[in-house]
Amino acid sequence: FTHHNSVGKRENATPVVLEMEGELKPGGFTGIWKEGPRSGKYGSQFTEFSAPSLMRHTLRTEQFTTLTVVYAVPTTPGRCRLMARFPFIFSSALPRMFFKIVPRWWSHLNQNAILEDDQIFLHKQERVIENAKVVKKQSYSQACYMPTKADTYVSAFRRWIADIAGGSPSWPEGMVDQLPPQTVSRNQLLDRFHAHTENCKSCSVAMGNLTKIRKALRVVSLVALVTSAAAFAKSLSPKVTVAFAVVAAVTAMLREFMGGLVQKMK
């Protein structure tokens, strides 16, 4: 629902029938979505929760295998450090070659956008659930209405937390076991620079390089524009005037495009 126009569209929504494979255990659970994504185009998707913090989706076809591998490690109440990988294993050499030449920071732009689709919802809903637990003395199943098969894995994970893991992470002695106040600033919740970029070698280096290139492009664009104007004023060859004008325009557009990439890293 939250990933509208990022990995799907709400108007294309269909029932997601998730099933447990076996019982919930101290070590986690496994499940299957028999139809799988894209209305069954790629076959069944398998899910594994390996306690306490690993979630893995696996989708296998004749052409490729793709995995979503996520570790979510609680750091303080209301915060987790997320470590995610999205491996693709191709039977053909051409897709493998393509994925190797795509810079890691480029793929991070899209992956972070998908994570941020959930950020505001999770931040606020966590406090609603905490209020139901502390003030209303409700369990998670009482506080949340989850009538569909799409809720199967969430329900199983919450039962693992409540029945097996003691209800919450084991925080270090002396740590305040309370959620911090709700953040009302959208910019603070979606602060990609401090949440990811400054800690990611690929993204931080790319951001620095893009900033330097933009400065150089600004100089080139201005010089080309001035040269084009001077050539026109001196009635030089129209080809010279047009050539420098084109250089000025192209470098300005490149600078604008790179500026958009830098903004996405902030």
Model feature map: region roles:
Residues F1-K266:
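Rieske [2Fe-2S] iron-sulfur-binding subdomain
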